[in-house]
Amino acid sequence: MCELYSKQDTLALRERHIGPSCKIFFAADPIKIMRAQGQYMFDEKGERYLDCINNVAHVGHCHPEVVKAAAKQMELLNTNSRFLHDNIIEFAKRLTATLPQELSVCYFTNSGSEANDLALRLARQFRGHQDVITLDHAYHGHLSSLIEISPYKFQKGKDVKRETVHVAPAPDTYRGKYREDHEDPSTAYADEVKKIIEEAHSSGRKIAAFIAESMQSCGGQIIPPAGYFQKVAEHIHKAGGVFIADEVQVGFGRVGRYFWSFQMYGEDFVPDIVTMGKPMGNGHPISCVVTTKEIAEAFSSSGMEYFNTYGGNPVSCAVGLAVLDVIEKENLQGNAVRVGTYLMELLSEQKAKHPLIGDIRGVGLFIGIDLVKDREKRTPATAEAQHIIYEMKGKGVLLSADGPHRNVLKIKPPMCFTEDDAKFLVDHLDGILTVLEEAMDSKSGTVFSENTAYRTKMPKEIQVELPNLSATEAREIPRGKRNGVCSDQQALLSKRLKT
């Protein structure tokens, strides 16, 4: 790719022509990316960066099979979804084959936000109820209907929570209301949802849906305790509502053993609606809502046609099919287990070594490192997290920090991430943490405060029962091919490390 402008000119033109609310990574010192391949990105100087946060390029940046599928279909046909063509049917068939039998009807859209917006419409049409229960710190998209149900956004701005929206505590067993030492955190958190339902009913309100990411991403890489979703679904169904599982950031095999993250919680948990996006097209805009026939028929009974000009177009579906093919052919679910297990093992060693690491939680290639100033108090190390991501960038590793305190390092790399990549990441993290902690010790426990000059430069921008698996055992998992969900022999979940 030829560089049109210098980095300085690109920044100046962006400031002039792009809205100021459109933020970029590393705003204090942004990277100008010119090309990417696999798990690597390259700047205008040819410097290589290991991409550990871009879960859009799911099977790897510019994967040749995906590029080929897009170009081939673009040369042949691209049109709107009112014309009959095979790609949309084949894609719907392949997608639903990875899901429980009840989830059999697809609506194709173009982004995760579109998918979640449509999911709300389906839920509200189903029984005519209007209220929605969401989790604290949740983010479900940028549309007005989704900002309303995203505390991650509306709590930071001037928007006021609408009376149709109810916020339940995030099921965080590390720093939430009910922690790992609670006798039954799943029931305690689910009872919070039950309480919200009862209070809504006492005010004459009716619950249309409960919506949650199968694992909270922007909320801090949170994995709910086992049994939580089952209990919540029971309460929601009794209230006449539906359960929406948002898989936009965590689906398509990222957790390893399962194709969809909600499947980690057991066969007795089946959402009524599943939304998907981001990795679905490996960077191409495509998303989908999958639901039951009953809910789809209720939506149709309104008499209003649902039409999305580009949703399910031939090119998008060809790209989506290619992504599914690559996941299967390259056994990327198995890779997520092998590399994820190895990475968690390396990080557990770092946790024992570095007091700044309060908690490590993750499944497959979805991992969060919760940084703290004090392990006992679990005081979020927000400024330190920002320092670390900039230092890691200087070492050629791209990370970001998120969560309500922006102190959780997010690791969500392309699925072709290797063990060598994992070691490269951890080796540099180890070095940076060592230097930082030495500086903190010399200054009585803190280097950066929220008000330091350094801080002002920063961008403002399941727990489940799992087998104990060593990295060696994980690497010995067979690399066999299989359509849909990997078998137990192919993949096992990474375990969540406790404090």
Curated annotation (Swiss-Prot):
Its EC number is 4.2.3.2. Keywords: Lyase, Mitochondrion, Pyridoxal phosphate. Belongs to the class-III pyridoxal-phosphate-dependent aminotransferase family. GO terms for biological process: cellular response to glucocorticoid stimulus; ceramide phosphoethanolamine catabolic process; lipid homeostasis; phospholipid transfer to membrane; response to food. Catalyzes the pyridoxal-phosphate-dependent breakdown of phosphoethanolamine, converting it to ammonia, inorganic phosphate and acetaldehyde. Homotetramer. The lineage of its organism: Eukaryota, Metazoa, Chordata, Craniata, Vertebrata. Its cofactor is pyridoxal 5'-phosphate. The modification N6-(pyridoxal phosphate)lysine is found at residue 278. Its main location: mitochondrion. It holds the Pfam family Aminotran_3. SUPFAM superfamilies: PLP-dependent transferases. GO terms for cellular component: membrane; mitochondrion. This is Ethanolamine-phosphate phospho-lyase. It comes from Mus musculus. It catalyses: phosphoethanolamine + H2O = acetaldehyde + NH4(+) + phosphate. GO terms for molecular function: ethanolamine-phosphate phospho-lyase activity; pyridoxal phosphate binding; transaminase activity. Transmembrane segments: none annotated. It is found in: Mitochondrion.
